[in-house]
Amino acid sequence: MSSVKLTEYSHGAGCGCKISPMLLDEILESTQKTSVYPQLLVGNANKDDAAAYDLGNGTSVLSTTDFFMPIVDDAFTFGQIAATNALSDIYAMGGKPLMAISIFGWPIDKLSADVAREVIDGGRSICEDAGIPLAGGHSIDSPEPIFGLAATGLVDNANLMQNDSAKKGCYIFLTKPLGIGILSTAQKQKKIEEGHIDPAIQAMTTLNKVGADLAPLESVVAMTDVTGFGLLGHLSEICEASDISAQVWFEKVPLLPNVEKYRQLGCIPGGARKNFASYGDKISEMTQQQREILCDAQTSGGLLVIVKKDGLEAFKKVTEAAGLTLEPIGETTVKSQHLVEVL
C-alpha cells in the first residue's frame, strides 16, 4: 500500500465532483437539430443511467461512462471504487456488463507511475469480480488524478429498466445505506476516527449485481442507482419522468454507522448544497438533518428500486439470496404539488 494520500491532490471527491443538476440542464439544453435514431431505445431524454441501442434480436447494447477524482487516499481502493461506480449504471438498467475500457488522467509531474498502476489494478480487480475484461483505455496528463470506466453491457429488451416506467402505489427500496458523502468529507477534513470510513469503503466497492437479477421480475417497474445527485435527486428524476410523486419515510432510510455524528460536526460535502439548490424547490419542507442526509452526494451508491406492493415476495426472494435485508423507505403516489414529500 502506498503512503501517498490521493485526496490531497484533488479539489473534489468521487461523485461529489459532479456538475450540479441545475447547471447540467443548462449545459445540455441545445437548439441544435438532432437526428432521430429508431434503434436508440434510451438516450438522454429522461436522465437514465445508460444509453440502450436495440440490436433487433430482442436485446440491446448498453453504453455508459463514469469517472471522477479520488474519494479515498489509497490508490488501489480508489480504482476499485471508481470501477464499481461505473459498472453500476449497467446493473441499474437491468443489464450485465460485457467489457470496460479505462478513462485515466494523471498528474505525471506529481505522482509516480507506481501509484498510477495501483489505481488501474484496483479497477481491474473489480472488472474481474464482474466477470469482464478491462480491455484497454485512454490516458492523459492532467492536473488532478482522474479514473473511471466506459462500460458496455447487454440487456434483454423486456428487462430494460428506465426512469419513466414507475407507477403510483409502489414501494421504494434502497439497497445500500446513505452517508458516503458525509463520511468521505470527514476523512478529507481529517476528522474521521480510525475505522469509521471502512463501512463506506465496503459499500462503495460492492457491485450492484442484484440489479440484473431484479430486472426480470414483473413487480420491479423502475430502477436507478443513487450517486452524485443524492437520494432525493435521483428519486426526483424517476418521479418527473414517470409523472408521479413519492413519499420518503425518513426514519426508514438506512444510514452508514456514525453518519449523524459527522453530520453534526459539519462534514457536509459541497455536492449536498449544490443538489439542494438545484432541486430543493421540488421537495417538501425538510429539517436540516433531512436535507443534509437525503441530498448527500453518494459515490457508488445503492440501487433505488420501485416495486409493486403485490410483488414483494418475489422481490425479497431475490434480494435475500443476494444477502440483502431490505424494508421499504417510502412509496410512490399520484402526482402532487411536490415531486417528493419527506415525512
UniProtKB/Swiss-Prot annotation:
Listed under GO biological process in this entry are:
selenocysteine biosynthetic process
Write down the species.
Answer: Sulfurovum sp. (strain NBC37-1)
Site positions (Important for catalytic activity)? 18
Keywords on record: ATP-binding, Kinase, Magnesium, Metal-binding, Nucleotide-binding, Selenium, Transferase
The record lists the catalysed reaction(s) as:
hydrogenselenide + ATP + H2O = selenophosphate + AMP + phosphate + 2 H(+)
- Superkingdom as given in the UniProt entry: Bacteria
Record's function text: Synthesizes selenophosphate from selenide and ATP.
- How would you summarize the oligomeric state and partners of this protein? Homodimer.
Give the protein name, as stated in the record.
Answer: Selenide, water dikinase
Which Gene3D superfamilies does this entry report, sorted A to Z? PurM-like C-terminal domain (3.90.650.10), PurM-like, N-terminal domain (3.30.1330.10)
**GO-annotated cellular components:** cytoplasm
Q: Where is the active site?
A: 15
Recall the GO molecular function terms of this protein's record. ATP binding; magnesium ion binding; selenide, water dikinase activity
Q: Does the keyword Magnesium apply?
A: yes
Residues binding ATP are 18, 46-48, 66, 89, 137-139
Q: Its encoding gene is what?
A: selD
Instruction: Tell me how the cofactor is bound.
Output: Binds 1 Mg(2+) ion per monomer.
HAMAP family reported in the protein's UniProt record: SelD
Recorded hits in Pfam families, A to Z, give: AIRS (PF00586), AIRS_C (PF02769)
